Amino acid sequence: MIKQRTLKNVVRATGVGVHTGEKVYLTLRPAPPNTGIIFCRTDLDPVVQIPARVNYIGDTSLSTCLTKGDVRIATVEHLLSALAGVGVDNLYIDLTSPELPIMDGSAGPFVFLIQSAGIEEQNAPKEFIRIKQRVKIEEADKSVMVEPYNGFKISFGIDFDHPLFNEHNQNATLDFSSTSYVKEVSRARTFGFLSDYEFIRKNNLALGASLDNALVLDEYKILNQDGLRYPDEFVKHKILDVIGDLYLLGRSLIGSFSGVKSGHTLNSQLLKKLLATKSAWEIVTFKDPSELPFAYTPVAMTA
């Protein structure tokens, strides 16, 4: 039987929210089988818990935000991406702010935290959501789609009119049967343009942004002294975001995702349309490990 997984130990980190600029204390705690991923606002009395599920998605203009009543938790996608990438099913995530810490702008520090805590199997079957038919959303020149595939594959294309983007690949297809999430995706950082910075600051956004937690570009070049971590870091970060958004389905996806110039808003619309199209998916478990798509085998996920 392919089993659910949680952390072996409690692990903590501190950082700042990229939009609020506030200091955030983050604690990851093991959770029982069938709990799922639960965010807990421990700065509130009583504590408010928000499940990482599609029906709690709120604002998606700059990041993926979860809401419950008037309580919100912003920028959940990087941590969710890390949890999906290493295969954690059940977890309590305590935080003392309405936004997760941005860390270095990638999922790498979260992967390190998870690996530091250790992962343990639980005595309950892991559920997957398997795509049975294509579901697509198009909006002008943007599109997102999921379709059947016996594994986990993401294709993504971006299109920025900037000298640096023209030099680097703006399209990528990653099949996770042969691609290591940890090595080849998790360290891709979020990026932004200096030309947008003034507008963003005027609107009291990105108060915690810096060259330590984002790739920043002027009209011609990257301002970060260390340069790119991957030649295709820009499009890989978009893939990292997609993996986090997809994990709001509450289960690992068996299927293929394709996106063109999409962001969190279009991603969330696709998730809602998918779940509403009952004939397009099914929940599956695997008694026989040999039937599991290779992308989800322990060998592939820990590489």
Swiss-Prot record:
This is UDP-3-O-acyl-N-acetylglucosamine deacetylase. Zn(2+) binds at residues 78, 237, 241. Its EC number is 3.5.1.108. GO terms for cellular component: membrane. GO terms for biological process: lipid A biosynthetic process. It comes from the Bacteria. It holds the Pfam family LpxC. One of its GO terms (molecular function) is metal ion binding. Keywords: Hydrolase, Lipid A biosynthesis, Lipid biosynthesis, Lipid metabolism, Metal-binding, Zinc.
